[in-house]
Amino acid sequence: MKYLRAALLAALFLFSTVISAWAEDVVLRSRDGAVELSGTLLGFDGQFYRVETKYGELTVDGSGVVCEGPGCPSLTNFVAEMSISGSSTIGEVLMPALVEVFALQNGLKAERITEDDTHFIYVLRTDEDAVVARFAFRVSSTDEGFADLLADEADLVMALREIRPGELELAEEAGLGTLDDVNRSRVLALDAMTVIVSPVNPISAMSISDLARVLSGDITNWRTLGGPDAPISIHMRDAQSGIAQAVEDRVLRRAAVELRDGVNRHATNGELAQAVADDQLGIGVANYSEVGNSKALALTGTCGFSLRANRLTIKTEDYPLTAPMFLYIPARRLPKLAREFLAYTRTVPAQIITRRAGFVDQAPEEITLNAQGDRLANAVRVADGDAGLSNLKRLIDTLSPLRRLSTSFRFEPGQTRLDAQSRSNVQQLARAMEAGIYDGRKLMFVGFSDGEGPADGNLRIARERAQAVKLAVENAVEASNLSQVVLTTDAFGEAMPMACDDTSWGRQVNRRVEVWVR
């Protein structure tokens, strides 16, 4: 929270974007002159005024009022304004690529104007050179993105982690809505937290529990992990970066430990990866998309299962340390062109751009059962007794004619609520169904569980989860005839584990709902 407050104060003084141009006094008067409202203009989307008044922030339909004052926008030559602040990982490569292709597909020219190292503006023009939009970027950190939003200096936040409870509370108090709702946050692309070491380090895998012990200082020598008798040197991004905070939230906090003192901090992802690559005794946690010359470790458990980050394991969320890239959108109207850009980020062309930019896209991929040998081997290994073998046979008979979609669903730890990536998957699958991609096909939502507790109970829980996800997708479909696609459910409980059940991490990976198609 102290970093949030510091960033918020900094935002009040440092962030100067096109949004600040609106901050002038206006008077909105009804056309019959009977009603008058004065205040500071915060924004105009071409149809609605957003004004800070003595009654609080109000949104007023421009068709019913006349605007007077120095801050009044032009109604005939309206320019859509949007400011975007947050993670440099997202803002330096991915968002510019999406803006440029979005402009091209809409017959617009995109000109990038660089103001300094952290500020740039995209000006979108028609063929007649008329300016129709300005998208202003501030690329810094996830922390500062949320601070800019709270300071009313940003319309969108680029984040490498989920919003924290303190930020969520402040946003609600500021009237920005519940930012972890499905309509207030969306996954732009996928990434993962990857444990990295030097290429000469003999270690090839590590458990998440051991990672937490290393980061907290409980393990300080590589010999404990099967390596050389030498001290471990820890490298991390700066404390305000999204990846460092994601490690804190999802690794350290869940293990009830804190990062040890004496950690080597780095200002950029590239510097972090190179420092670890050059340090034979070093270890760090980096974005999957920016491992560089370092070596990425697999995640393993005591039962022998191991998971390595790659495009498919990140898409399916089988790799437990996925790190979605978020856009957070406050509860306010954006200009029409800005809303169209946000809709574009979920399209198939946008997924292609995302992959070309070096990130993991959200486009579903189909995987045959024959291509899942490791999973089947795990299933055979844990099949226990006649009941276990019978369930495994039913699984193979049922799923052999189908293909697994990379779209999967998992839940928040200890909750029935879908996690952030899965909530985005609900929307992605619903949009695909609306587009007719699965017309004439069968989609089966298949539930799996961990191996804790009685098998019958696990099978029942897995079936209930599959039914809940199917219902969530059906409810998210807004403009489609569901009779064109067959939606069913099934469940196999603990029959096909992905990870060891002796840790909370492994159990969370195993509790899932997959989608299989025919």
Which residues fall in each region the model found?
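Exported/periplasmic ABC-transporter solute-binding proteins
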Residues: 25-438, 463, 467, 471, ...
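Sec/Tat signal peptide C-region and signal peptidase I cleavage site
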Residues: 18-23
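Bacterial N-terminal signal peptides
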Residues: 7-17
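Periplasmic OmpA-like peptidoglycan-binding domain that tethers envelope proteins to the cell wall
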Residues: 126-130, 139, 144, 448-518
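Positively charged n-region of N-terminal signal peptides that target proteins for export
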Residues: 1-5
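Short loop/turn segments at strand-loop or loop-helix junctions that form parts
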Residues: 411-412, 445-450
